[in-house]
């Protein structure tokens, strides 16, 4: 069985054996089989996987840190705990880190924060995979902002940005995990957004940066799992150089990739990519 999230210690590195022991191998196999069936029969869009992701996320974060030891990915189960976690990374001299943050108080929503320490200044940017018009993202953003302001971290600059790439109801956790990895892999491309955050150019600190203002800052690889074709086209209209960019080992462009993962749901073209990503992530936890 999967242990309660509050009982799983995700700080520090665990071995592959310890990671796998957080969840029954047999149960995990059954979950993966059901996820694959949901994609095959087309029921994936109308199912809610959020509670399952909340339970599995600690193991996924450990696995991510095992794969990328310098990513410094942290799972924060409530905004109330965020400031002390940030204080710890600053005091430990960590220059760059990521935080997957959960709503807490029984909530299911996730976002991801990218942290960078530049010339004695702290830059924190919350990346929301959906948009702030929905209750979950809005509440998590407010709680996060309040927690950071209450602690009064020295020379700390905080902004919230919306990616608006999520259309289904329960994929915020997998989106946040995928974005956390991209924030690490593409870290050299993100220097400008952090510099603009510190300068106060990125946002006024009160209102989130809308997706059309965010798009020029991010490489096309951040949009691999974009669920809506219209949203993907919006990004490519702003970043035409991304149209021909190869985004994976299959030599696919972002448009090729969308077409190869698209499904028609309620008359709309939607990508099933992030649901396949969940399966791939869950499979990394299986014992050989």
Curated annotation (Swiss-Prot):
Broad EC category: transferase
Residues binding 1D-myo-inositol hexakisphosphate: 182-185, 224-225, 257
Compartments where located: Secreted
Catalytic activity reported: L-threonyl-[protein] + acetyl-CoA = O-acetyl-L-threonyl-[protein] + CoA; L-seryl-[protein] + acetyl-CoA = O-acetyl-L-seryl-[protein] + CoA
SS bonds (residue pairs): none
Activity regulation as described: 1D-myo-inositol hexakisphosphate activates protein-acetyltransferase activity via an allosteric mechanism: 1D-myo-inositol hexakisphosphate-binding induces a conformational rearrangement that stimulates the interaction with acetyl-CoA.
Record-annotated active site: 109, 128, 172
Protein EC: 2.3.1.-
Gene Ontology cellular component terms for the protein in this record: extracellular region
Coiled-coil zones: none
Keywords: Acyltransferase, Plasmid, Secreted, Transferase, Virulence
GO MF term (any one): acyltransferase activity
Cofactor dependency: 1D-myo-inositol hexakisphosphate
UniProt-annotated binding residues for CoA: 109, 167-168, 227-230, 266-270
Its job: Serine/threonine-protein acetyltransferase translocated into infected cells, which inhibits the host immune response and induces cell death by mediating acetylation of target proteins. Inhibits the MAPK and NF-kappa-B signaling pathways by acetylating protein-kinases such as MAP2K1, MAP2K6, MAP3K7/TAK1 and I-kappa-B kinase (CHUK/IKKA and IKBKB) on serine and threonine residues critical for their activation by phosphorylation, thereby preventing protein-kinase activation.
Similarity section: Belongs to the acetyltransferase YopJ family.
NCBIfam families xrefs: PRK15371.1, YopJ_YopP_only
Protein name: Serine/threonine-protein acetyltransferase YopJ
Highest classification ranks of the organism: Bacteria, Pseudomonadati, Pseudomonadota, Gammaproteobacteria, Enterobacterales
